[in-house]
Amino acid sequence: MLIIEVSEIRGKCPVYKKGDKIVIDGPEIVLEKTDAIRIHALAPLLHYVVALRDGVDPRKLGLSKEEDVAYIQCVDPGEPYTEGGTVIFKCYIGE
């Protein structure tokens, strides 16, 4: 399974808090194990989910300096442009 965990929030996010997770098993989001889903977060995540789920090294995708974790951020720029904030997601294979 691919685990997408909120690692950091820069500003304010009305949906996520640090430690929240989205869990993906194959082609499905496992709703019972997922804390929240925000439309702003789906756009950047969906570009990489299949590759990461299938074991592509995040370094080759330019998403990390480490081989077993990727970092992707939400598209909300936060202050002073919006009242929200940027969420940094840590993506890794887990159970």
Locate each region found by the language model.
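Short, structured beta-strand/loop micro-motifs enriched in basic residues and often containing a Trp
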Residues: M1-E8
